[in-house]
């Protein structure tokens, strides 16, 4: 579970909601919340994290809820998609042969702007036209394939098909602004159904060139 902005202040409510959901069946059976750990998803040396809550604890333990972004500074960045990415055009999911740098980066930009508006009360002050032009200038190398992914919706009482593309994407000629959004996307994910965990990626150092991160 990744909480952004003001949602971080609702951690206790989220824990309670999970406890209640587990008691009233999640998926096809009941479960029990036994522990909550705080993990820094951007820490390459992360282990199991630090326990901040268990049912026998009266309060959520004090903990650092911040993460520090590492922004790529090299002239080539490669990412590896861990869960299916669903970019769409006119309501149709884009397969590997239809992916474009504009579709990828402008999806990241829009998501970042919306999160800022809902969590900080105002959208980011962005020049969307300029960012679109910078996206068009990026050289894209796609090494991806389609992966079907399904989940069961208890509310709709049916299986939902949420397939997307997985694999690697390499970007050349990235502007500084796009590098920032690429780093932010490590936490926000990219594409449709990101709230379900889709569109999650990591930096692939095997395909990175330049002097590392800022």
Where in the sequence are the language-model features?
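RNA-interacting cores
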Residues: 1-214
